[in-house]
Amino acid sequence: MGSLLRQCDGIPDGLLEARPEDLADLLGGPTLLHLPGRREQPLFVSSLLHGNETTGLLAVQDLLLQYRSKELPRALSVFIGNVEAARDGLRRLAGQPDYNRVWPGTDYADSPEKRMMAEVVEIMRQRQPFASVDVHNNTGINPHYACINRIDHQFMHLASMFSRTLVYFIRPAGVQSMAFAALCPALTVECGKVGQSAGEEHAREFLDACLHLSKIPDHPVAAHDVDLFHTVAIVHIPRAYSFGFGDSPVDICFIDDLDHLNFRELPPGTTLAHIDGIDDLPLEAIDEQGDEVSARYFLIEDSMLRTRRAVMPSMFTLDERVIRQDCLGYLMERYPLPD
């Protein structure tokens, strides 16, 4: 079977004006663009790894329109990912793997998508990228923030150009930024909810700033310039349990503003949900080693699900499809800055 990947040296006709839902017809599938610039080492940008997260694509379109009649400051390679899911406005289609879980290092079984991501990494390895930025949206109430997979001064400097809020994580495996961390400083940038012009503008300005960098500093980031957090667990809801928000008649009825807890340091005893007729903890929390650690972070008390210890959530969402396809969210703790 042939590769899913298309490559193009240049900007396909109509790309800069196309809507995300039009890209499957316009491009024919996932596409890697290579554009020349004054500095040869390319900035790599990935977009639409989730088909309903459109800010990355819109930021790239705006950026390239800005440079339509002038030379890019640096070469640029752009990966446009799950265009089939984008046609339907979905994170991924039924039967598709998650495009941000199948990069080298993944736990997922072999698939055409997994082979494609390995191909993208190998192509870019030969081009020696300057830096890598994967642009995402999320569905809950979150600030704009940057994620890194290595505690490294260059990674942190690049991330701090986007936000003072930085998150270090090594799970889930198979994400784009972790695969590219072996090649160059690599980030995931989270730009808030889809459809917010501030997120698109922030992403475009950041990508433009990256194109103008001649080098990335390798000295320590000043402690007063960043807040660094560490993802300590991914939280899932087992399929055996029904769930809802507010006053739903379900097994787990979360508070209706659960997503407003994101990036807030919650004290022990914070109530998250009412539990109906369940004795065991109804959440799974998986730590960096892959161990189930829900009892470390949660307890049931008077039919209420509460935090056992101080913790900070991120990406808690009210979107039931996202929760089933991915997770409820993440738990974080503060992380010391390296010397």
Predicted regions and their residues:
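Structured catalytic-domain cores with a bias toward divalent-metal coordination
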Residues: 1-339
